[in-house]
Amino acid sequence: MKYINNCKTVDKLKNVILIVIIFISFFIISSNVQAATLTNDQTPNSKIGWTIDGKKIKSGSLSTDYNTEQVLNDINKFQLNTLNIPVMIDVDNISSSNMIVDKISEEKAINLIKQLKNANANINVILGPYPWIEQGTKAETEWKPNNMNAFFLNWKTNVLKTLITDIAVPYNVTALNIGSNLVNMESEENNWCDTIDYVITYYKGLVTYRTNKWDTASWAPDSITAYNNKLNNKLFSKVDFISIAAYFELTNNPTNTVENLTSAIENSQIDFSGQVRHQNIKQEIKNFYDKWNKPIFFGELGFPKFDYASYEPWNWNPYKNNDINNVEQANCFEAYRREFQDEPWFLGFSIFAVGEQSNDKHYYPSQESTEVIKKWYSNGQ
């Protein structure tokens, strides 16, 4: 007579049932996520173009030390419909391939999202990892991991999967930004495509990647090659919309009229020893839409409240001057509004930065800038 170990059989059956329950639970949770709708509304009677749930994105990017009460005030102050919420990712140094989600920053983001929902604020959320390198002393543009394979494995499993499981799915986040300004990793297009495939397995919302600004000049052929490499990166084929940190360099002037700035967006006046770039920034941006048929979103759009705001917008004080200039900041915002507001391929913008306005927040919009921002998509579209 053959002996059967019924205990082992029961244990195996329990394991099978447990696996089935976990799978069904994951399916139910994923299915309950109400994915936002990205649509292109271009008809003979409508030139609105690309929208999310019928609206252009009018967002505010939060500094990592944002104050929740200030954030809620700024939503009304700037008449925003979206928040770009960062979660700090602790990275030991600029050559590290390891990283971990900062739990305090993650909990802060969760609490903010809960407050938005409790207030019935009807605010969309774009969630994104923010590399906090060497205690915040190094920028993400300096990060160059010593092992790319290890970096992408850890970025997927330690960072993106954590944000999806802890925040994006349970709190029905509108969009997940899988990376920002990672200039030394961006060319790893196969790894990025694999990362996006991994993300959409667990998350059914919109997915984007934010690329950094670029410079081109006909007399600098390497700059043209670098731009074309960026333009043709197939990671952009996988996202729902293309995000750009729009810190483009426009003029060498300390102050400008709005008209001069709008002209510079299509013909950069930046001058190096008598050589002018003549970069057509607007056309180079549109080329991404033409290439990939993905709408363009300014994931960061900001200018310091100083003279020379249009020279190096990513650098709050390039000439180490202390000449505060609220109007120059506002003129920069107005120039971008005039150039991009009515373009159907343009999805919207995110102001850098709101949610905290202490003295070191040189990019927080001035009152003059606030008036410009309020009238951008003031009709709700």
Model-derived regions: residue spans:
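Sec-dependent signal peptide cleavage junction
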Residues: F27-D41
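Boundary/entry segment of secreted carbohydrate-active catalytic domains
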Residues: T37-L80
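Aromatic-rich peripheral "rim/lid" segments of glycoside hydrolase catalytic domains that contact
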Residues: D41-T51, A309-Q381
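Substrate-binding cleft and catalytic face of glycoside hydrolase catalytic domains
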Residues: F78-S96, K108-M185, F306-Y311, F352-Q357
